[in-house]
Curated annotation (Swiss-Prot):
Subcellular location: Cytoplasm
Gene Ontology cellular component terms for the protein in this record: cytoplasm
Name of the protein: ATP phosphoribosyltransferase
Reaction equations catalysed: 1-(5-phospho-beta-D-ribosyl)-ATP + diphosphate = 5-phospho-alpha-D-ribose 1-diphosphate + ATP
Assembly and interaction partners: Heteromultimer composed of HisG and HisZ subunits.
Recorded family membership: Belongs to the ATP phosphoribosyltransferase family. Short subfamily.
Pathway: Amino-acid biosynthesis; L-histidine biosynthesis; L-histidine from 5-phospho-alpha-D-ribose 1-diphosphate: step 1/9
Gene: hisG
The keyword Cytoplasm is assigned to this record: yes
Disulfide cross-links: none
Amino acid sequence: MPDITIALSKGRIFEDTIPFLKAAGIVPSDDPDTSRKLIIGTNRPDVRLVMVRATDVPTYVQYGAADLGVAGKDVLLEHDGIGLYQPLDLKIARCRMMVAVRDDYDYASAVFRGARLRVATKYVKTARNHFAAKGMHVDLIKLYGSMELAPLVDLADAIVDLVSTGSTLKANHLQAIEEIMPISARLIVNQAALKLKNTAIQPLLETFSAAVPKNL
């Protein structure tokens, strides 16, 4: 079995992680976008990749099924973080977590009146903390996709979601009215593995760190 297992998710994060892997001399043997394999070997016999759902990356690393992983800050905030070390902000998959409403919704007035808003999101923990810090009372509705639909069918007054260009919001007559925080992908490491496999993991951390864009 390879010494190092790295958990990744398909899509943008995987594509943005490729330069970091190359910097460490790691080349995947298969393209996860075209391969059905969930365990992908590399040109290095001591390193393999496991392809999992983005929301599951921290869990695989936490329980030692993977030694390292790359996960968005949004995912990590919803995870308890036990047993995880987060040494690097890779500055990839960058976006913003925002509060958004319909174009015709007077959010400022609703907040001023102390209205109890319904907010749809898959980031329940983060949203709860955000609104609590503002002294707002909200009812959170957990959704797993198509957040933009919720205000359009009166399921929710607002949504909390990730926004990159804002084009999806605009196409659905929504507007972002409040930024909660900037989001990017982080390198995470199993704390036990960092101690037990330090001679193998530390060089990876150093090469990943050197590959992080310095002008962002």
